[in-house]
From Swiss-Prot:
Residue numbers binding FAD: 4-34
Quaternary structure note: Monomer.
GO molecular function annotation: flavin adenine dinucleotide binding; N-methyl-L-amino-acid oxidase activity; sarcosine oxidase activity
Claim: Cytoplasm is one of the keywords in the record: no
Known EC number: 1.5.3.-
Protein keywords: FAD, Flavoprotein, Oxidoreductase
Cofactor: FAD
Modified positions (S-8alpha-FAD cysteine) in chain numbering: C307
Annotated gene: solA
Protein name: N-methyl-L-tryptophan oxidase
UniProt keyword annotation of Oxidoreductase present: yes
Length: 372
């Protein structure tokens, strides 16, 4: 059998692509080296932020606004919502370049973002402490996503729509010829007209020339009470420290508040190098500088987890066809800020398989930018 689209890697982007391509009427085969959702990639740990006024640059805003519409639609397929509109407050020095990008994105796209000075911040959320020179940019329409529930939902919907799924079966080789794409797996060879490579952190095992660096990252849950929950209207947050370190976190659930540090981490070259949480001496204390200064009422570390970023050299996404192979799309280099975009990236992959022109300007995400 020849498929219209084979998906190599069915985590966040791959799961979304499988659903949207199958829903569009294509014959699709989803593959993964493990059984998604799983612990080997970048999607576990229950929650991920979604921000609209984007500190990483306004080129992302059209993508994230489309993603939000798709998240809202996906949430209707579950009793438990996938998207929680908790609001997100972005904290940092008034001269922060990241916050300047947030403000610029909000102005350009007329987004609902409120600017709060330090006094107003601490009045609205007495649990938060910031220096006098800090501001907060509050996005009331943003919030967080339940990442593993999202992937489970996409996989179920794709399967119900007739998508073939081959999991716990790593792809060992990809071959291109005039008839399309062939993949080799432990279960045999499979053929398709087109392929999506969304293999996440270890994409270089299949495409060694891609400029992607795996980075071991950790996040942890700390003791918190009801003051820090959505029931008390406590928001999700990002925070920039005076030294430039960036943190992110979520409202407390079941008296546990999850927080992680976005920058830093350990460069790794193989899956076995991603040691579990607490295997690196600094893991448990990584969030202390932020908690001690900004959320001093939070208690001790309860547990944590390790994940992996697939960083590109400039930490912007890679969305492009493989050089010399126009029938193979690569989506990688999501650099620790990609999950919120998963549905729109999956939709882009489905449009690619359908032969449609993308609805977005993907020029900033081309591979050619690294050879200029």
């Amino acid at each position: 059998m020849k498929y219209d689209l084979i998906i190599i890697g069915s985590g966040s982007v791959g799961a979304a692509a499988g659903y949207y391509a199958t829903r569009a009427g294509l014959k699709v085969l989803m593959t993964d080296a493990h059984m998604p959702p799983h612990q080997q990639g970048s999607h576990h740990g229950d929650t991920r932020l979604i921000r609209h006024a984007y500190g990483e640059g306004e080129k992302y805003v059209p993508l994230v606004l489309r993603a939000q519409a798709l998240w809202d639609e996906l949430s209707t397929h579950n009793e438990e919502p996938i998207f929680v509109r908790s609001g997100v407050v972005n904290l940092g020095p008034a001269d922060s370049a990241f916050l300047a990008n947030v403000a610029r994105s909000a102005q350009q796209w007329q987004l609902n973002v409120e600017r709060l000075d330090a006094t107003a911040l601490m009045t609205r959320w007495p649990e938060i402490r910031v220096p006098d020179n800090y501001i907060g940019l509050f996005e009331a329409d943003s919030g967080f996503l339940r990442s593993e529930l999202a992937i489970t939902t996409w996989l179920r919907l794709a399967r119900e729509a007739g998508c073939a799924q081959l999991f716990n079966s790593p792809v060992s080789h990809i071959h291109h010829d005039d008839n399309g794409v062939t993949i080799e797996t432990s279960e045999g060879c499979y053929h398709a007209s087109k392929a999506l490579i969304s293999a996440g952190t270890w994409v270089k095992a299949l495409v060694p020339e891609l400029p992607v660096q795996p980075v071991r990252k950790v996040f942890a849950w700390f003791k918190a009470d009801g003051r820090y929950s959505t029931k008390n209207r406590f928001p999700a947050f990002t925070g920039e420290m005076p030294n430039g370190d960036h943190y992110y976190g979520f409202p407390a659930e079941n008296d546990e508040l999850k927080i992680g540090k976005h920058n830093g981490g350990q460069l790794i070259q193989a899956p076995e190098e991603r040691k579990p949480f607490a295997a690196v001496a600094s893991d448990g204390a990584e969030a202390f500088p932020f908690l001690r200064n900004v959320l001093p009422g939070i208690g001790g570390c309860l547990h944590g987890a390790a994940c992996t970023y697939d960083n590109s050299p400039d930490e912007d996404f890679i969305i492009d066809t493989l050089p010399g192979h126009e029938n193979t799309l690569v989506i990688t280099g999501l650099s620790g800020h990609g999950f919120k975009f998963a549905p729109v990236l999956g939709e882009i992959a489905a449009d690619f398989a359908l032969g449609k022109t993308p609805s977005f300007d993907l020029t900033p995400f081309r591979l050619s930018r690294f050879s200029q």
